[in-house]
């Protein structure tokens, strides 16, 4: 079996046929979604996979309609999941730039509907709600972008049941928003407005399909992605689903040569459940994931028209080497920089210590326009233009994909799987993950000064890296693979998880080693608050000590 043969087998025509077949309509816990899962079941079965379907309980939310008028003029708007419905909310409309929403005075926004810029984001809504705003309307791109307004990752628990925003939210296009801002300015800063929204939030059964190709070992690599969509969702995410189907077609005949198994796991609940599908699947299979899942390869938003930037895709320290190899082999990319995973991309498996690589592998170059401005406010200044002006809009149709770009991106994923399934030594570097954690802890120690002592943990991480490097030379490959997996089940949660490994942190930005984030606040706290924060931080150090001790035992066993 030659790796180049696997890459050469990727077929752009088949990929686009799969995309069109999967695009059964807007897929949001409805009949179109059922049809799409039926299509996927047939495609995976025809490819030669062992296919199972599950229905897992989850909380989802779908926008059912919205109306908005200001100063007697009606505007087309969309409302957003996980926000309350509003039946004719009447209030004055005011404009507040998005970079001032966190500092606006209550006098400025209280009891008013606030018009602001960018994609509909929960932190912005939360800041305005805390200041007494009655509702929020966002100015997005040339097309109105769908977003989910929630910090709750997956379905709520009793602890997070009341963490949703309590005011209605809508979005309008950049053109309408610009004209409305001009009218507000002419009117002296306020206009009478009326906002109505209908949002249906409910518990339902979230479908998950798993297509397995069994190799020589029960340990497995998984390729994951979401089926649900805004509009036809060709880019987001029929492209990622088609990637999974194409990889299954290519790999199934090679099962007897595979050293490890592969599972293609696709779910709903991403767009309208804030990752409720991946979260529910993790919860249902946690022990197996922790023990036997070697790698999570997330497949999302592939092959976009004009998507030529291939240097920024996410990876963990343990998978950066594999990412570089795959991008170089499959796409000739030699300047990949990558980035750390953010709290997004269905990354629901950190608590189980699963190494992850990729989500998208290609993005748009920076561009001018309203959509670019909106993406910039969401993703930061960045070095890309995101996923295109059609992302999360009704214009995300198959013509927004470039067949050659799609095949190129799928070849990158094919390279990842070729190495992960057929290499004698699994190309996941546990020592790199250990060393990155050590470096992050050194940075936290420098900030904390004498307030906290991480020296014992840092010394243990040095010993752990040395032990892994020594056993990598002496162990047989399979034994070392098992050893590394046990180490990563301890180290990855320390690097990425703030709370319990069995629950899921909020869908908000977090620093590396988030359990130590209070260090950044120590200097600004009162003595009483600082002492309380130090109690929490000392407990975090205990967690670091316990997990690194277990990891060192695993490395030396």
List where the protein language model places each region:
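Second-shell loop/turn segments in exported
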Residues: 2-9, 23-31, 84, 95, ...
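Noncatalytic luminal/extracellular "stalk/propeptide" segments of secretory-pathway proteins
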Residues: 2-13, 17-110
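Catalytic-core environment of secreted peptidases
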Residues: 9-33, 43-50, 112-118, 125, ...
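Soluble metallo-hydrolase cores and metallopeptidase-like ectodomains found primarily
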Residues: 73-104, 157-235, 246-261
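Extracellular/luminal Protease-associated
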Residues: 77-168, 334-335
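Acidic/histidine-rich catalytic neighborhood of metal-dependent amide-processing enzymes
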Residues: 122-123, 205, 229-318, 346, ...
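Active-site-adjacent substrate-binding region
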Residues: 305-435, 496-500, 504
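C-terminal non-catalytic alpha-helical accessory regions
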Residues: 407-415, 420-557
């Amino acid at each position: 079996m030659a790796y180049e043969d696997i890459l050469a087998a990727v077929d752009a025509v088949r990929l686009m046929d799969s995309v069109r077949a999967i695009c059964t309509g807007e897929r949001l816990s409805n009949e179109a979604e059922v049809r799409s899962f039926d299509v996927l079941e047939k495609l995976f079965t025809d490819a030669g996979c062992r296919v199972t379907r599950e229905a897992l309980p989850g909380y989802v939310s779908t926008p059912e309609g919205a109306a908005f008028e200001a100063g007697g003029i009606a505007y087309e708007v969309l409302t957003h999941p996980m926000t309350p419905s509003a039946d004719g909310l009447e209030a004055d409309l005011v404009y507040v730039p998005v970079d001032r929403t966190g500092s606006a005075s209550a006098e400025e926004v209280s009891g008013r509907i606030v018009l602001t810029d960018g994609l509909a984001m929960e932190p912005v809504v939360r800041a305005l709600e805390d200041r007494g705003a009655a509702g929020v309307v966002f100015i997005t791109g040339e097309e109105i972008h769908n977003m989910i307004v929630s910090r709750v990752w997956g379905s709520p628990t009793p602890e997070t049941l009341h963490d949703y925003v309590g005011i209605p939210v809508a979005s309008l296009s950049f053109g309408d928003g610009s004209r409305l801002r001009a009218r507000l300015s002419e009117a002296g800063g306020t206009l009478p407005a009326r906002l109505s929204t209908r949002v249906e939030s409910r518990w339902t059964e979230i479908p998950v399909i798993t297509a397995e190709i069994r190799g020589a070992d029960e340990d497995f690599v998984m390729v994951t992605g979401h089926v649900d969509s805004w509009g036809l969702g060709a880019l987001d995410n029929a492209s990622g689903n088609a990637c999974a189907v194409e990889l299954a077609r290519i790999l199934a005949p090679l099962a007897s040569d595979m050293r490890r198994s592969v599972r293609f796991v696709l779910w709903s609940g991403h767009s309208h459940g804030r990752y409720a599908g991946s979260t529910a699947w993790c919860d249902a299979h946690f022990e197996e994931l922790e023990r036997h899942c070697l790698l999570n390869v997330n497949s999302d938003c592939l092959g976009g028209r004009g998507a030529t930037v291939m240097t920024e895709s996410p990876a963990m320290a343990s998978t950066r080497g594999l990412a570089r190899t795959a991008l170089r082999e499959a796409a000739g990319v030699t300047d990949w920089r990558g980035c750390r995973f953010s709290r997004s991309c269905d990354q629901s498996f950190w608590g189980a210590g699963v190494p992850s690589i990729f989500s998208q592998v290609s993005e748009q170059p920076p561009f001018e326009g309203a959509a670019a401005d909106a993406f910039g406010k969401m993703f930061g200044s960045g070095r890309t233009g995101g996923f295109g002006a059609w992302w999360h809009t009704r214009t995300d149709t198959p013509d927004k994909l470039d067949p050659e770009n799609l095949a190129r991106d799928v070849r990158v994923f094919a390279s990842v799987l070729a190495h992960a399934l057929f290499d004698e030594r699994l190309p996941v570097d546990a020592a790199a993950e250990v060393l990155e954690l050590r470096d992050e802890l050194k940075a936290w120690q420098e900030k904390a000064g004498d307030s906290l002592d991480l020296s014992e943990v840092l010394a243990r991480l040095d010993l752990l890296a040395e032990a892994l490097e020594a056993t990598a030379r002496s162990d047989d490959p399979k034994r070392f693979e098992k050893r590394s997996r046990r180490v990563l089940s301890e180290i990855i949660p320390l690097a990425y998880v703030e709370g319990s490994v069995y629950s899921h942190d909020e869908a908000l930005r977090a620093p590396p080693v988030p359990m130590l984030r209070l260090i950044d606040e120590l200097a600004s706290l009162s003595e009483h608050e600082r002492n309380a924060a130090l109690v929490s931080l000392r407990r975090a150090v205990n967690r670091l000590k316990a997990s690194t001790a277990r990891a060192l035992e695993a490395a030396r066993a």
